[in-house]
Amino acid sequence: MVMNNLNPTDFTPWPEQFSQRYREQGYWQQRTLFDYFSDSVKKSPDAIALIDEFGQYSYQNLYQKMISLAAGLSSLGLQRGDNVVLQMANRAEFYLCFFALTMRGIKPVLALPAHRYLELSYFCQHTQAKAYIFSDDIVGFDAQQTAQKLRSSCPSLLHTIVCGQSSHEQIQELDTLYHCAEDDPVTDSVFADQVAFFQLSGGTTGTPKLIPRTHNDYAYSVLGSIQICQFGPQTRYLCVLPVAHNFPLSSPGALGVFYAGGCVVLASDTTPHTAFRLIEKHHITVAALVPPLALLWMKYAESATENIASLTLVQVGGAKFSEAAAMRLPTALHCQLQQVFGMAEGLVNYTRLDDPLSVIVTTQGRPISADDEVMIINDEGEPAAVGEEGLLMTRGPYTIRGYYRAPEHNQRSFTEQGFYITGDRVRRTAEGNIIVTGREKDQINRGGEKIAAEEVENLLLQHQDVHDVALVAIADEFLGERSCAIVVPDNGKTLKPITLKRFLHAQGLAEFKIPDHIHFVDELPKTPVGKVNKKWLRTQYSH
């Protein structure tokens, strides 16, 4: 029987016959995310687990601080079943909060540093969050001012907690919550079938959808990734990407490093200079990058003076990595390339470490699990032949069956048989490797950050001088895609791009969602059935 901490209308469980199979196959081991961390503490308590710009922590140090923080959070009245929005820069406190919350059955919503008031208020209201925990060192963001605004607009929000120095009496400092606690944390009321936390979808409509991840499914994804990527106590992993992203959290990411007994090193910024300095200083062996960062690293390496000989593996994912760039990377960085194609909703594909170079360069790999069911449907609605392009659908032991509190969206995103409709267009080789060819959903992938066109369009339409608008992706050599807004002004009004960009900023939209380009036209082109012809717009404005 599945024990869960959400209302049945909020969470879509796996059907019992699937749950039973996943348990029998050993995928779901009925242990919490914190249980696996505790295993590493017992094996190597004095080993260094984490290094950030402020210091380093052994496994035992982290363990004790997690338990202490969990006690402090409980003293505020936070309890099993509550939701908390967590937004942190790349620092140790992210993992301390993540484990302190999940070990008590409190579910963090993993907001990204790029999110602003518009997204954060939605997360708080949609989940009825009891607390907002944040760091005050997110570049270009007055988080404490935003916290005050959230406190006023979200009735459920009882606590705002800052990692840093508080500037307001209603904002509590995280450092005051490290309470004395017993060595053994209270986890007896937390079941592995329960939702542990929420991740965020890229989304194609409105604000991001919330992805409920259970202890069982997420742990299996991490453990399977560890095996494929051969992480172990010797692994020294550089986290350059935002810590809350699925890729650097679980593929195998920081959780994979912790569970394998290795060491995570956090970069405070994304510059190659910082990364290469950390690689040399801490003898980094593995790093995970999105394509734009991989290109920057390759360029920087041409004149770099740092010694990065310890680096043995670079993972590239989050967006399609061009074949030409993939071919160059092993030589440019003197290490192995691994392509990763995954999604926060579940399915993750890897090229294997022993794959031929031709496979690593030209494909995005194959799934973690033998029970990852992958269907590719062609334009006629039939299963695609080998090598034929089609729409990717999937279900499996770590792919969700529904978004949180989104019944209408779930009807569009999941089939009656429980397959998740990814929106990715792919081909599959005879060996089972997947090649990503594009997107079917109305979504822009800007260097790994997903933008729902409809969300930005709806905000622009709120401007009094905008009559109509279409947001499309245009190809970009560096980011993969950039966003381009084609705007029809109202009644011949004169508008400037900067005016609309300032308007979107004022609405609290995340910086990466602000259109890179804005063009003005008299009318938008239409298809024969009266829809905006975005295909024509993409072609027209890509030059």
Specify the residue positions occupied by each region the protein language model found:
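Structural core segment of the AMP-binding/adenylate-forming
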Residues: 3, 106-175, 493
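Conserved AMP-binding/adenylate-forming core of the ANL superfamily
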Residues: 29-30, 34-38, 46-91, 95-99, ...
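Conserved AMP-binding A3 loop
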Residues: 58-60, 196-220
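AMP-binding/adenylate-forming catalytic core of the ANL superfamily
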Residues: 115-122, 132-134, 287, 396, ...
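Conserved AMP-binding/adenylation subdomain of ANL enzymes
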Residues: 219-236, 246-286, 299-300
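Gly/Ser/Thr-rich phosphate-binding loop
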Residues: 284-288, 298-359, 373
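Conserved beta-loop-beta connector loops within the AMP-binding
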Residues: 360, 375-393, 430-431, 493-497, ...
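Conserved ATP/PPi-binding loop(s) of AMP-dependent carboxylate-activating enzymes
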Residues: 367-371, 382-413, 451
